Amino acid sequence: MKVQVKILDQRLGQEWPLPSYATTGSAGLDLRACLDEAIQIEPGQTVLIKTGMAIYIHDTNFAGLILPRSGLGHKHGIVLGNLVGLIDSDYQGELMISVWNRGQNTFTLEPGERLAQYVLVPVIQAEFEQVEEFVATDRGAGGFGHTGQK
């Protein structure tokens, strides 16, 4: 599948590699922090970081997800401020990453550092059918631990 990409920061593809799949089994493309200089992200602080690129999916059967990189979250407490970024197929603006330091220590984010992943996913747009009752199931309305822990 082809997705249109507009490079907004010329350092992408010159100083830093363009997003690519690291292995044949990789699901995500790494997104980089397009910064002019390193920034300090204090514990509890949330900042919005430019990626230097815009992606236009065009096909309404797909959407993009911006997801955290596992190492940053586990080792440094750096996760996405909105937990998951949803990029609709008709969005054409620059991809931005909301970064939240949920850790205990100040984190230094360097220019060009890999910060998040972009994953393309299929989308099914549902049509709601209003009903008075649902067909009964064994589970019913049970949730939030209803099926047990083991």
Curated annotation (Swiss-Prot):
The keyword Magnesium applies. This is Deoxyuridine 5'-triphosphate nucleotidohydrolase. The gene is dut. The keyword Hydrolase applies. Its EC number is 3.6.1.23. It is an enzyme of class 3 (hydrolase). Pathway: Pyrimidine metabolism; dUMP biosynthesis; dUMP from dCTP (dUTP route): step 2/2. Belongs to the dUTPase family. It catalyses: dUTP + H2O = dUMP + diphosphate + H(+). Keywords: Hydrolase, Magnesium, Metal-binding, Nucleotide metabolism. HAMAP family: dUTPase_bact. Its cofactor is Mg(2+). The lineage of its organism: Bacteria, Pseudomonadati, Pseudomonadota, Gammaproteobacteria, Moraxellales.
